[in-house]
Amino acid sequence: MSEQNQGQPDQQHSGDHQHHHHHHHHHHHSQQPAQPIPIDPNVNPANRIGRYQIIKTLGEGSFGKVKLAQHVGTGQKVALKIINRKTLAKSDMQGRVEREISYLRLLRHPHIIKLYDVIKSKDEIIMVIEFAGKELFDYIVQRGKMPEDEARRFFQQIIAAVEYCHRHKIVHRDLKPENLLLDDQLNVKIADFGLSNIMTDGNFLKTSCGSPNYAAPEVISGKLYAGPEVDVWSSGVILYVMLCGRLPFDDEFIPALFKKISNGVYTLPNYLSPGAKHLLTRMLVVNPLNRITIHEIMEDEWFKQDMPDYLLPPDLSKIKTSKIDIDEDVISALSVTMGYDRDEIISVIEKANREAAAGGATPTNQSKSTNEVLDAYLLMKENHTLVKDLKKSKSENIESFLSLSPPPSSSFPNPGSTSSAPGVQQSLTYQTLATVPDLSTLPNSTIAILPTSLPSIHRAYMMETKVNDPQQQIPAPQPTKKLKTRWHFGIRSRSYPLDVMGEIYRALKNLGAEWAKPTEEELWTIRVRWKYDSTPQLRVWQRTNLMKMQIQLFQLEPNNYLVDFKFDGWEQTSDESKNDASLDYKQQDLDEVGSFSAYPFLHLATRLIMELAVNSQSG
C-alpha cells in the first residue's frame, strides 16, 4: 500500500467532498434556532398528525418524507418519518415491518436516534423519532480534516453505538454521512439503524446506490449475505474522511469507483499517526473474513485512548456466567412495549437459567437464540443497567439518553391491543432470510407472504394442519404456552465450517455435480453446475442442460451455521451448442422454463439434502 504526503490537496478535497454528499436530500437538515418555536394558534390544524404539529418538511429519505414536528402539549421537537405502505407492499411484507419497527423501539443508546413511537394508519406507518439538527459531515466540510483527538471522540461514539446494535443482532448496513447526525453538544446520533432490514429481501440492498463510496466490497458486488462486517468497513471509510478530509475511494465514474473499492486501493497520508494508520489498514480489508471485528477495534490501543467509561460495553464474561435476574420493572415495561405476557417472560427466564444450571448453554447463548422474548428482555434489562451506570457516573450524556419520550398521541392503540402482535424473530438474526414467524402468532386475516418465505410458511402451515387434524387425536396445547416453532431456510449446523463444506463437496461429488474452484474471497461459496436429466414431456429438456446453483455458508451466531441454496440459472452443454443455428431459441426456452418452473432446482436441492443426511448418518 503506497503512502504519500497529500499536503495541500486535502484542503481542496473538502470542497469536493461537499459536492459528493450534498446532492442527497436528507431529512435532518435544518437551520432552525435551538429554542422551541411557539406553535402559532392560527396554524392550520389539518397539518397535524396525532398530537404533533408539523412545522416543515426536512427532506426525502430512502423511506419517504421526513417532517419536523412539535408535540402540541410539551413543545418537544421530533422528526416524523412517514413510510407509505404502498412502497412496503412492493418490497416486503407489512406484518414483518411492523414487528421490526416495534423491536427498534427497544433500542436505547446515547448515540442512536431514538424511536419514540409509531403511529399507524391505513396508508402510512409514521415513525416518531428523536430530532437532531446537524450532520457530522457538514461539520467536516466546514472544518476540513480534524485533529486525531477530535476524530477519535466521534469515532468512539460511532463504534460504541454499532457494537450495541450488533450485540442485539441488528446490523445497520448503510452507514453513510446522511445517517450520522449531531445534537447541540456535538454528540453523534446514528439514524436509520435496523431499517435496511425492512427494505431488503434475499437480493440485498436496493437502496444502497445513494452513497456507494461508503459501501463495502461485498455489498457493491451484490453478495447475498452481508453481516456485521459491512458496518466495520463503512466505519473505516468514515474514520478516514474525518482524519484526511477526503474520501479513500473516489471516482466520478461509478464503474471505476467500484473497481477501486473491490481492489481496496487507497493511499494513507504521511501525517497520520502510526496508530491511526494501523487501525485504518485493519478496517479497510477487502475480504470480510480477514477484516477486524468491532470487538477487536474496541481493544485497539489508538481507539482506547481517552475512552469515556459510559461507552464501554458491559462485561459479557460476567453476564454469561451469572443467572438472569427477574426484574419486575423490566418485565412490566416489556409487556407494555411488546405485548408479551408476564408469565411467559418469567417462564422463559427460568427455562434459560435451568438450562444453564444443567451445564447446557449459558443464558446468553443457546436459549437466547431460540427465544425472541428472552432477547427483548435482556435488551431492556441492559438499558436499565446503562441508565443506572450513567446516573452513577454523573455523565453529561445522561440527559441525552434519558430525554423523555413525547407523551403518546391520542391515536395510538392502547398497550393491550398489541398483545397479539407477532414476535420480532425477523430482527433477531443477522440476515433477512433466516427465520419466519410461527403461524400461530399471525392474525388470521392478515397472513401476507414474503416471496422468500414461501416454502417455510407452507411447511409451517402443513405442520399446523396436521396438529389440528382431529384424526391425529393430539390434544390442542394451551395457546399461551404453545411452543414456538422456528423455520429456517437451507440447513442449520453446529459443526465446524470446514467440516460442513467438506460434507457438501462429498455429497456433490456423489451426485455427479461439478463446481468451480473457489477463490480465497469466496471460500464459503460453492458455484455448482449440474446435469439435469431430460424428460420427454418437455421439448426443452430434449437436450441435456446444466443447471447452476450457488451454495453458501452463513454464520448465524457463534457455532451456528446456515447452508443456503440459491438457483443461479441454466447453461447449455458446450458440446451440443456447436454449429447449432437454433441456439438462441434454445437459450430463450431455457430462460423461460427457468423463470416459470422451480421444480428442477427444488428437485436437485432435495437430492443434495438427502445425500447430506445419508452421509451424516453413515459418518
UniProtKB/Swiss-Prot annotation:
EC code: 2.7.11.1
Transferase found in the keyword field: yes
Family to which this protein belongs: Belongs to the protein kinase superfamily. CAMK Ser/Thr protein kinase family. SNF1 subfamily.
GO cellular component, one term: vacuolar membrane
Keywords: ATP-binding, Carbohydrate metabolism, Kinase, Membrane, Nucleotide-binding, Nucleus, Phosphoprotein, Serine/threonine-protein kinase, Transferase
One Pfam entry name: Pkinase
Major enzyme class: transferase
Name of the coding gene: SNF1
SMART domains: S_TKc
Entry's Gene Ontology BP terms: CAMKK-AMPK signaling cascade; cellular response to glucose starvation; establishment of mitotic spindle orientation; fungal-type cell wall assembly; invasive growth in response to glucose limitation; negative regulation of inositol phosphate biosynthetic process; negative regulation of TORC1 signaling; negative regulation of translation
Sequence segments annotated as region (Disordered): 1-45, 399-423
Protein name: Carbon catabolite-derepressing protein kinase
Subcellular location: Nucleus membrane
Organism from which the protein derives: Candida tropicalis (Yeast)
Function: Essential for release from glucose repression. It interacts and has functional relationship to the regulatory protein SNF4. Could phosphorylate CAT8.
